[in-house]
Amino acid sequence: MSSRALPAVPFLLLSSCLLANAVHAAGQGDGSVIELGEQTVVATAQEETKQAPGVSIITAEDIAKRPPSNDLSQIIRTMPGVNLTGNSSSGQRGNNRQIDIRGMGPENTLILVDGKPVSSRNSVRYGWRGERDSRGDTNWVPADQVERIEVIRGPAAARYGNGAAGGVVNIITKQAGAETHGNLSVYSNFPQHKAEGASERMSFGLNGPLTENLSYRVYGNIAKTDSDDWDINAGHESNRTGKQAGTLPAGREGVRNKDIDGLLSWRLTPEQTLEFEAGFSRQGNIYTGDTQNTNSNNYVKQMLGHETNRMYRETYSVTHRGEWDFGSSLAYLQYEKTRNSRINEGLAGGTEGIFDPNNAGFYTATLRDLTAHGEVNLPLHLGYEQTLTLGSEWTEQKLDDPSSNTQNTEEGGSIPGLAGKNRSSSSSARIFSLFAEDNIELMPGTMLTPGLRWDHHDIVGDNWSPSLNLSHALTERVTLKAGIARAYKAPNLYQLNPDYLLYSRGQGCYGQSTSCYLRGNDGLKAETSVNKELGIEYSHDGLVAGLTYFRNDYKNKIESGLSPVDHASGGKGDYANAAIYQWENVPKAVVEGLEGTLTLPLADGLKWSNNLTYMLQSKNKETGDVLSVTPRYTLNSMLDWQATDDLSLQATVTWYGKQKPKKYDYHGDRVTGSANDQLSPYAIAGLGGTYRLSKNLSLGAGVDNLFDKRLFRAGNAQGVVGIDGAGAATYNEPGRTFYTSLTASF
């Protein structure tokens, strides 16, 4: 891959820590003491953004009341603006749904654990339609070891840089403390329908002091979710003929996951803390027959119920925190390594994303991420009370994928400047960033937060991300909040890599029926989005009501090309001289909607909480097609009753609005038949409760999908040879499921 290199030394990003030490030492070197008069300290910009209309917090108590069966995405999806979708509107890998914030897609959702990026899903091959065979990155931390989850949407998320154009999910774990505490939790669920996979998990956590200045935290987890039966969707599949007669779209695959993580916190001085952390996780699937095009072969059938992909994630980090006379500082260095081991798949046409019987066995793709981050927060009085944040960041991502760059050019013809075989399996990218934010108190109740972030990508080049957020108290009870920011996402390593090649004999070629290639493009621009929101909130005596309008003007979204850039030379028969497409930037797209919240205290201990997301539009402005298949509206409602000091009861319901499929097929023609099918509105209700048996023991029980509303996957959104499209019916919604949980703590 070509690159515009930027020399960078990651340890320079720890300069904030070194600067803080230097300033502190200068003030203490002669024994002098810096005395500060009484002053108001304004919150940092990061703290202030958590009060923005596009920010929601999920607490440990919330998780205990609505325990996920295995993956945290199950509770994150209940926040305003959040749904579970695929990366595109194709419906491929339809049951591998991930967090989608404000309709921008999972690839534009940045996942963090304790403020540090999680990138394991980027080790999974990126398909022609923009999908990955991935469960996402929200299942690396056991639910019972989470302190809180911050869900940050819109302009407030732009400060986090690459990949946060839709939003950020920051999973905060329970930390080391001054007293010894521990917990052991078990959870099991029991689907009413035996064809649906059950879940069970067990986790432990232990934290406390080792010495006066040394403390620790360790947690572990083992969990299993069984796969659905391979034929769960029989009788619901789209029409299939010829070689595809009798094939079925798969249900939800299962997963076995194990996690262990340890943290050591050393209080160097009263002002400084140094943390060392290491973690290891393993996730392995339980295969139920899913392929990219919902087709099948004997190899697929042989592997039913077996493990066909394994993800091994290792993380190592060191973090320094300082509280100084002049402000505070944070610096960390994190190394993340993901080994993605899976069965070899085809890369051409209908065989893309299906096990390759001619190349049986596993391969391993390895992704290495290095992140260095440093920032200082400086309280100032320059006309107004304010806190200035200055920081820098350096990231490097290296991918070695020996399977995904193996498509040859014998049939379609040779491509100028590309080796027909034995291409490099390696790709990499580096980003250097500087950022500044200033949280200014213009008057009591009025906060203005301007910000600017500069990112230099060694292949894509420079990106500037300005932002401006405002919070103004109209009255003691009513607050107006507004924000605008330019967010961005760099192309991923597959899109940028000219050695990454896919092939089709014509079925997947836009605008024509002859053969074609899709090639990586190192001339891509970064995706950008100007995110705007305007919200108003009323709050008084537990009553909270808010309404927020948001609009994202999306530019340079990266999709597979719509026009050939060249033609191959030579080849075989009717497939010779294949058209050459490449990943390209779509000029303009738009996402627009409303978010509402309403919390009503009905009586002592009884509260009714609601949030609504209503999508006004989500479309590619060039084609008019949808960006992703999301419900027209989503309403989450919960009645929460603290019946006694020991007993808590909840009733929940989520209504999903109509879901419309994409309008155009792979050739650019209007879809017909079952590919037009929409999903009608539906609701999922639940009941749950927790009871504290003693000071150290609590019991939970409940039922999900109380009224047994089930959905079945019919196929992908649009068809291929022998398989009709399924429209929006691309995923399974499991039926009534009972669960129990037990937690012991001290």
From Swiss-Prot:
Induction: By iron and enterobactin.
Region ranges (Disordered): 82-102, 235-254, 397-424
GO molecular function: colicin transmembrane transporter activity; enterobactin binding; enterobactin transmembrane transporter activity; siderophore uptake transmembrane transporter activity; signaling receptor activity
One cellular-component annotation, GO: cell outer membrane
A Pfam short name: Plug
All copies of domain TBDR beta-barrel, residue ranges: 179-746
Signal peptide boundaries: 1-25
Ranges of Polar residues composition bias in the record: 84-98, 402-411
Localization of this protein: Cell outer membrane
Membrane topology classification: Multi-pass membrane protein
Keyword line: Cell outer membrane, Ion transport, Iron, Iron transport, Membrane, Receptor, Signal, TonB box, Transmembrane, Transmembrane beta strand, Transport
Chain span(s) of sequence motif TonB box: 39-44
Domain TBDR plug: 47-174
Protein name according to UniProt: Ferric enterobactin receptor
Organism encoding this protein: Pseudomonas aeruginosa (strain ATCC 15692 / DSM 22644 / CIP 104116 / JCM 14847 / LMG 12228 / 1C / PRS 101 / PAO1)
Encoding gene, per UniProt annotation: pfeA
